[in-house]
Amino acid sequence: MFAALAFAFPQQLKSSRALPLLNRWQQAGPRVSVSIDSFLAVAPEHAYDDLIDEAASVHRVDPALIRSVMASESAFDPWAVSRAGAQGLMQLMPDIAVAFGVENPFDPRQNIMAGAQLLRELLDQHHGNLVLALASYNAGAGIVAQYGEIPTIRETQDYVKRVTGLLADAHATP
């Protein structure tokens, strides 16, 4: 398995995120629902396009925004877990996942649908203000409400810049 992936994706395997992902796949064994052939056929950033499009349609959220959040949050790793405990592709905190009815935060469909629903709610809460919605997604709505603007938390400020940059790039690409 590793030989096939190393041959097919030599540059990607140099990234710090690739090897832990491959190790988790190897350890998961038969629980992994993706085959090597399907992995090799679809780049990770496009593996979830159908789910992203579905979530975007259901929750009226720009699919490029969902993809940008997912890229920033998990680098398209469905098994990602942050130091704070956020889980899955859209890095849902456990309490948020429960509130949105997510039974398995590592299930791509459940995670993407809940993440898109959360984005929609935050956009509505902030009257369409993308910057405040993203700050709330990262730091929590309560903290953003306290500040009344992007909090002076470096991680949140960097997050908003990163996601809006990815979104701008996505809209600039034909």
Predicted regions and their residues:
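Hydrophobic membrane-insertion alpha-helices, especially the h-region
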Residues: 1-10
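Generic N-terminal initiation segments characterized by hydrophobic and/or small/turn-forming residues
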Residues: 2, 18-19
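Catalytic glycan-binding domains that act on GlcNAc-containing polysaccharides
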Residues: 19-174
